[in-house]
Amino acid sequence: MRKAIPRASRLRPTKEVSVMAWIEDAASSVLLVRQAAGLKLWTLPGGKVKKGESLVKALKREVREETGLRIQVGSLLGVLDRRDKDAITLLFAAIPSQASNKAKRKQNEIKKATFQSSLPNKASPSAKYFWSARRSPVKKAPKIRASTHQLPTALL
């Protein structure tokens, strides 16, 4: 019989968890947002998961805040473990759930939101990683396959 781990000894996640959305339009262009402050990098819409918030709710909130779009969240497409930042980013497929697929900026953190057919040079490390994994031949980056399995309810 296994002994329960004493409450004070239980593991607590130490990594910051972020979520990002891979949203394509009919022409297979991908929705990118440009940061308004700092290095003003292009990145995929998304952000940090708040304490007690599900991954799906966090992604819906972040995309809505940054672009004005309401989305339906699909499969997990990839994971980026940023050991240098003690952070992990999860990439999900998503589609706009409203009739219009035009992105509108709702937050002052984002300067611009637009569908792009290629990744701009001034892109965030996570955007470069996921773009390369989704769009490049296998020799440049490991291919990320969309999961056919649903995430455990505890993660949602």
Stretch-by-stretch model annotation:
Residues K15, K40, Q72, D86-I88:
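Residue-level preference for beta-strand/loop junctions
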Residues L39-W42, N108-L156:
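Nudix hydrolase/Nudix homology domain
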Residues I23-E24, L32, A94, F115:
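Conserved hydrophobic "DFG−1" position in protein kinase catalytic cores
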Residues R70-G78:
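A short coil-to-beta-strand element that immediately follows conserved catalytic motifs
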Residues D25-E65, L69:
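Conserved Nudix-box catalytic region and its N-terminal flanking loop in Nudix hydrolases
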Residues M1-M20:
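Acidic, metal-coordinating catalytic segment for phosphate/diphosphate chemistry
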Residues L80-K102, T114, Y129, A133, ...:
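Active-site-adjacent beta-strand/loop module that shapes the phosphate/pyrophosphate-binding cleft
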